[in-house]
Structure formats: structure tokens, C-alpha cells
Swiss-Prot record:
This is Small ribosomal subunit protein uS13. Keywords: Cytoplasm, Ribonucleoprotein, Ribosomal protein, RNA-binding, rRNA-binding. One of its GO terms (molecular function) is rRNA binding. It is found in: Cytoplasm. Residues 146-155 have a biased composition (Low complexity). Its main location: cytoplasm. Residues 135-155 are annotated as: Disordered. Component of the small ribosomal subunit. The ribosome is a large ribonucleoprotein complex responsible for the synthesis of proteins in the cell. Pfam families: Ribosomal_S13. The lineage of its organism: Eukaryota, Amoebozoa, Evosea, Archamoebae, Mastigamoebida. Residues 135-145 have a biased composition (Basic residues). Component of the small ribosomal subunit. It comes from Entamoeba histolytica (strain ATCC 30459 / HM-1:IMSS / ABRM). SUPFAM superfamilies: S13-like H2TH domain (SSF46946). Gene3D superfamilies: 1.10.8.50, 30s ribosomal protein s13, domain 2.
Amino acid sequence: MATVTSESEFQHMLRVCNTNLDGRRKVPYALTGIKGCGRRYAYLVCKRAGIDVNKRAGLMTPAEIEKIVDILNNPLNYKIPVWFLNRQKDNKDGKDSQLIANAVETRLREDIEALKKMRAHRGLRHYWGLRVRGQHTKTTGRRGRTVGVSRTKGA
């Protein structure tokens, strides 16, 4: 059953974790706009926060938004299982965490730089601009690379 709300209470755009979210979408699907938060994780966050999954994101109160942000930043405090997190047994500190927003891109870039620095096979493939995950490269992936041809003097 839909409730009628005044236009002043509804937020068309929400700012959560440095990301603009569409207030017209339902809460879990709006949360998927945050990098590092997929559909299953968004549903779990809504369940832990006690927010109705059929509610529109623009109708959330500031307290509910704060609760969601706290769960996104500290998932282990809300009994979200370790296997659900996107960063398990971190190479630097060995901790389990959920990376969201800009931290995902930053950590990925740091991981690739570390692979390059230690001269691992994957790091070298990244450095050379080749496929990393074992794909064949004889016939595919030729765009962008050119081989110079030298002309012969004569005729």
C-alpha cells in the first residue's frame, strides 16, 4: 500500500558515501549505485538497518541514512559474515573489510602497483598491457598495437 507524501519530504537525489543516489528507486537498488555495494549486499544492509526494501530511497529519514552509512562502513559490527565482504584477509594488515566508493578503485590500483613492483607474472602482464587471466592472444586482442613495416629501397 503506497502512502502519499508531500513533495517537500521527498528527496530526488541523496548523497551517501560520496555518491549521488536516485531517490525514486527502491532503497536496495538505489544503494547499488555505490561502488562496492551490489544487490545482495544492499538487501542485507537494509535488513540489518530495519528498513523496508519496498520503500523509496527519497523517503528515508536522516537517521535511517546514517544507520545505512554506519553499516556500510562497519559491516562486522552488525554481524555480516566475513565471506560476504569484498576484501578478505588483506595483504597489508590481514583484516577483513568491505571496500566502498573510492576505496575500491584506490585499493585495486595499489594492488596492481604492488604486483608490478614485486615483478610477479600478473604484474608483468599488466605492465606490458597484455591479457592477465590466461586468455589466448595469438589472434584476439590486436587492436591498439601496431607493427611498423619498413619499405625497401628500389623499383
